[in-house]
Amino acid sequence: MANPRVFPLSCVVQQYAWGKVGSKSEVACLLACSDPLTQISEDKPYAELWMGAHPRGDAKILDNRISQKTLGQWIAENQNSLGQKVKDTFNGKLPFLFKVLSVETALSIQAHPNKELAEKLHLQAPEHYPDANHKPEMAIALTPFQGLCGFRPVEEIVTFLKKVPEFQSLIGEDATAQLKKSMNEGSGAMASALKNCFSHLMKSEKKVVVEQLNLLVKRISQQISNGNSMDDICGELLLQLHQQYPGDIGCFAIYLLNLITLKPGEAMFLEANVPHAYLKGDCVECMACSDNTVRAGLTPKFIDVSTLCEMLDYTPSPSKDRLFAPTLSQDDPYLSIYDPPVPDFTVMKIEVPGSVTEYKVLTLDSASILLLVQGTVTAIIPSVQGEIPLSRGGVLFIGANETVLLKLTVPKNLLIFRACCLL
């Protein structure tokens, strides 16, 4: 009998403290729906579902015809299943990690190094930078999803410096004056002034940060209790972040970074060196296979301030420019493609109406991982005359050049995300 190259996966859950708790978490719900034997603990966070072959979360293969236990082991012995170009380009490894995230409290403000810097940092400090790879990533919202991403337009930051004296006192008069002046001097001057402002903020004394933050929290709380809106200085968000990370420098970053709320299906792409933080909501995320993170705030972990201030991309841009729009397929009315400007990964969104009885998954010269978010199907695999039932939360590995047909077993709409590598 032919060696199966399409099979279901049991994926690793990460229970980080910032995750949504119990059945409020989309990660937990996907898990429970795909495996009725799963017991969800209503007092534990379910933060991330890892779908891939990363050593810290290698998916288990759910097919007793296959001797290898995990996807990583199987790919190592079946490298042709990656597709010829993917195999050659990425040294016989799956180049992406596919995830679902359920965020309750803010993740740290962070940026990921480009390949050149990642190699240097890994050599210098492997305990903080565990590999030499870059880590571009893309988040696609499943529910309304809030995050910080990239530096705001300079005029917005200047407005906050006027309205939030506590913020201005940390940035300092000279850096504030330089930023205002840069508005008439072009993009290079603005980036340089932003770097100066951010560096001043990050290098502020802890004692001074705590004092100014306490003053600001008190002022906002009083105004809100008097019935006044503080939306013009993101008052509610500041209180929320301060409650989660009291006295943390990252609370002030909301005045420097764009606040973005993605609607379901909207995406943001996070290139190397762009500062960002996920604040709340559920998303599908795809990234290059790396663990390198340079943190800036909203974290009790190690902060490498000098590396961070040097590496960041200080290009200001409005929040709408941070949205990453998919392209609609010319040949398939149900297919949208999120194809970022990096070779490591592409994500496809498939939305099939319940009135359709069968859907042919696009055959690719790339290994792919398919996640069923909504619906119930039977996957038909002609190469081995096999059938695999999949319900909500089901995850399927599809080897390169394999044909898969999905039969809708219940007449309900399908929502599927599929990660692959289009070289």
Curated annotation (Swiss-Prot):
Enzyme Commission number(s): 5.3.1.8
Pathway listed: Nucleotide-sugar biosynthesis; GDP-alpha-D-mannose biosynthesis; alpha-D-mannose 1-phosphate from D-fructose 6-phosphate: step 1/2
SS bond list: none
Record key words, sorted: Acetylation, Cytoplasm, Isomerase, Metal-binding, Phosphoprotein, Zinc
Residues with the Phosphoserine modification: 102, 108
MF (Gene Ontology): mannose-6-phosphate isomerase activity; zinc ion binding
Protein name according to UniProt: Mannose-6-phosphate isomerase
Provenance organism: Rattus norvegicus (Rat)
